[in-house]
Amino acid sequence: MLITLLISLILLSRGKADFTLEIYRELLSALSKKGYQFMTFEQYCQLKASLPKKFVILRHDVDLKAINSLQTAQVEHELGVKASYYFRVVPQSNQPEIIRAIAALGHEIGYHYEDMAIADGNVEIAIAHFQEQLAYF
């Protein structure tokens, strides 16, 4: 509830949706000031039995412009925030130098899988494709 309210207030504060890094920085700062702890998906899984009362899992699916994700990761790093970045294995997203740079900032890297869609619903092909792609990461 509070997160929805914060997002609404920040993004609509200027009368229109604003998805700039400046506004994202404000959102992260506001959540931090309200006592929210940020964690990666892996941290969430590890802490399940003892999660803090207020927490945010930041998960980013990198679909198109990987450079934008690097800029987002840099903002998070400056604020001491860790996030999870899931990359597709397509040219727009799969840029190893950017993936390494985001990982070097301390963020979690994962495979944004879409194997069933790629395999057109064929489970055997999807599993084989998944194993191939997962080995990449």
Residue ranges, per PLM feature:
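Catalytic alpha-helical scaffold of carbohydrate-active enzymes acting on polysaccharides/glycoconjugates
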Residues: M1-F137
